[in-house]
């Protein structure tokens, strides 16, 4: 499982994303989380988390996309607790 999370993050780091692009999470209990500054997503700071309320996701503006959709968009929305 760690390897899958690592690969997901590695994909983010080595990929050049635009707001229209997306990446996949590989575990059914994972969602994707981005930390955003302003309106610009930072794919290198995105990672797959086991739950959208994971502490890592609590900073800045984020978007979560469940595994059931198969994709995690780089669009940013404000975090609402």
UniProtKB/Swiss-Prot annotation:
Disulfide bond: is it a keyword of this entry?
Answer: yes
Q: Which keywords does this Swiss-Prot/TrEMBL entry list? A: Disulfide bond, Metalloenzyme inhibitor, Metalloprotease inhibitor, Protease inhibitor, Signal
Q: Where are the transmembrane segments?
A: none
**Cysteine disulfide links:** 25-48, 32-76, 33-57, 36-72
UniProt keyword annotation of Ubl conjugation present:
no
Molecular function GO labels = peptidase inhibitor activity
Query: Quick one: signal sequence residues?
Result: 1-15
- Tell me which residues are marked as the site Interaction with carboxypeptidase: 80
User: What does this protein do, in the record's words?
Assistant: Tightly binding, competitive inhibitor of different types of pancreatic-like carboxypeptidases. Inhibits human CPA4.
What family name appears in the similarity comment? Belongs to the protease inhibitor I46 family.
Q: What is this protein called?
A: Metallocarboxypeptidase inhibitor
Q: Which organism is it from?
A: Hirudo medicinalis
Q: Provide the taxonomic classification.
A: Eukaryota, Metazoa, Spiralia, Lophotrochozoa, Annelida
